[in-house]
Amino acid sequence: MWDLADSEFAPEAAWRFGRLDNGLRYVIRRNDRPENTALVRMEIAAGSLDERDDERGFAHFVEHMAFNGSTNVPEGEMVRLLERLGLAFGADTNASTGMERTQYKLDLPRADADLLDTALMLMRETAGELTFDEEAVARERGVVLAERRTRNTYSLRNTMESLEFFFPEARAAQRMPIGTEETLAAADAAGLRAFWEREYVPADTVLVIVGDFEPALVEAAIAKHFADWQARPSPDQPDAGPVEIDAGGRGAVYLDPALTETITIASHGAWSDRPDTAAERRDTLLRVVGGRILGRRLQRLQRSEDPPFRGVSTGTSDFFKAARSTQIVAASEEGQWPRAITTVIEEYRRMLEYGPTPGEVAEQTANLRTAFENARANAGTRSNATFAGEAFRIARGESVPTGPLEDFTLYERYEADITPQNVLAAMRADATALDNPLIRFSGKTAPDGGIAAVRDVVTAALSEPVAPPEDGDVAEFAYTDFGEPGAIVADERIPDLGIRTLRFANGVMLNLKPTDLSDDRVMVRLTLDGGKLLESRAEPLAVELTPLLSGGGLGRHSRDELQSILAGRSVGASFGAGDEVFVSSATTTPRDLELQLQLMAAYLSDPGYRAEGLGAWQRSLGDFFARLGKTPQSALSEGLGPILSDEDPRFTRQPIEAYRALDYDRLRAAIGDRLENGALEIALVGDFDEEEAIRLVAQTFGALPPRETQFRAYDGGERERSFTDRRETFTLTHGGEADQALLRFYWPTTDQDDWDVSSGLTLLARVVDIALTDTLREELGQTYSALSSSSQSDTYTDYGTFAIGAEIDLSQLGAAREAMVATIERIIADGPDEDMVERARRPLLENLANRFKTNGGWMAFTARAQSEPAERERMLLAPERQQAITAADLKALAARFLDPEKAVVIEVVPAAPSS
């Protein structure tokens, strides 16, 4: 067992901890959710903080080199080896570098001993056997610089400048993991090896393996691969600071045309080492309650019809182990910063002066109790990822996860202490004084009067008297009686899948699939006829506001009232518009299933369309449109639709005035008939009793007035969508950095009605992705991530697209284009080799094999089990069809669809010429 000296608590008994003689630590947890899967993580306590001035970016560069050659795995073979075993690069095989640590990640699609052995072998290669071939370093340098170039956006630059302002002396402010162009360009094999040998030592390494394995088998495999790793002294861990505690009075203005107007005020205090004790957990709970109550007050203001700010955050947090920092952040519409920051400061001071009301405390304790109860009920089916996160909390010395059962017991012990007085005391003790704060303004244009004017407003807001808060009453939920329960007119079960399908007399369809995959969890999905097919060339934004339907509340409750009414209940309702349906989804518990169905039925039968639901969205439009085209990706997303559709308004961004003209009256006119009359299919997947679920649906949706029994065909031209006949190169411009460019090729294909063609195009996209990655990334070092995708519509007749592309340096635009064309021509001429096909196919087959191991996978089959039986059959046959595809089939598909001469080519280049 490891030393957990700073905690009063013991971890759950199911954990297995160990340490090899060389100092390497490991954590093992057996878990069968999802069954027969596992994950392997290796974390090295080495990040960008460990870099010397001339090594900035080296921790991240070394992470890249882990995939580029080691003693027993030649350069480029690690990813190929994993693909052959069913792990997709990026999805199942990945790594990340932060300021304090680097983590390598493998998600195993099967929990078999051979795959585990391979995974640990590869981790061991990364830990102690990297070769750092000079030519490999040179190639990967291009990839790392490409990643840096891609990430060099207005958002990252704003973050970096903000760190430098608030923590000017801190090492962390100068150690972004991506590094600098100068140090990366100068990096060589010797320098990277020196960093790796210094920082990658057993004593600073933790292995975490969670999954459907016997712990003894895992322990033996760890020893087999890592016991011979030679121990070396751990390097000193640099401090992330220093941070000047009494640094008030400074101010700064930072401008960028893509930024939202934002004011941040902050003060720093000394870092406090808080041991993991019962008393500290109690205080943490009180701080959480206080923070949520303050957030709730600010949320209420933001939901008003005329919100004083666009976004807001407040709180006190650690800056590594160097300081504590209290910050208030207010984002506003252009020129509205005085109102925004004044309002937020007023609410913050009201909280710290008077504390919460009893009603506010009651609302948050109800939410907390439910969260702890739900976690306890789901304890037996926690995911691999959940356990991995807990393992690293232990490994990093942050706290000891005590498990949902003990957590609930602890909460019950502390619940009586959650009083307004105790919450106020905890918040006051946590905050640092804002008497003379640091102030930073960021936005498009400087404030009138400069930073001095901002300080005058902040100073006034910090000194003005504030009134105490008022407590309000909580209403009863008004939607519990929908009339006479509906009668069942059809009740069947789909063989093999076990999905029960029912139809009520009013036309509502119900599909049920009970599972034991996640204890105490029920997924609910409503599929309603309509969607974007309701839009037209004359009304291209008809259903644009659908995601904001819930923001308008209900006829008898505002959204804010609902939040208080539903406190302590696991319910919710999101709405979205698909191509031909509307979808509302939620995850609840068996205890709250009745209320969940009542809430969804209420939104269907009595949406409120209250104007406050649009306030924040309407005020975000200016900033949204100001950011369009500020990065290559943004410029592409803006220009792609009109190019491919010949400016069909349905697939083209409309002017800002068109969005500003939208309101709930127009949404009601567009979707009101569908809410009232459209065909409706309800699906439940998870931990529930079938008969009880049927009874509850009968009382809610089954009791609604009769509605259409079939989803509409929409055969009056709504399904027509064209791909431009123009075959040329289009040039778009972006407002980002002068070295950033983006290249895309698009081809028209077909819809998904031909299953063989659709399956083949899916696999071909994966093959092309591998081929482009091998060429552009591994051989030429031109891009961080190549792209290949295929999309066959199930809505628009004969419509589909195939796309390839990459983000590249402007100077490499021509070379990248030649390489991409050559890659496609090679596949057309010779077809992919068998190894490439299997590397593409195996991860796809593993994903298909694991579909029935999660409720989400089952929902894909259950959601439209009655209205789309052919799609269900298609999904069931997908593995068989994928397995039958040959290299010759893929060659034929490439020849049929991917002629480079017939592509639409889009180049996105800087608006300003490169220097």
Annotate each PLM feature.
Residues 130-131:
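Penicillin-binding protein/beta-lactamase superfamily catalytic region
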Residues 13-14, 91, 194, 497-498, ...:
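Residue-level marker for the onset of beta-strands and adjacent loop->beta junctions
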Residues 183-223, 653, 659-704:
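Internal metal/ion-chelating core segments
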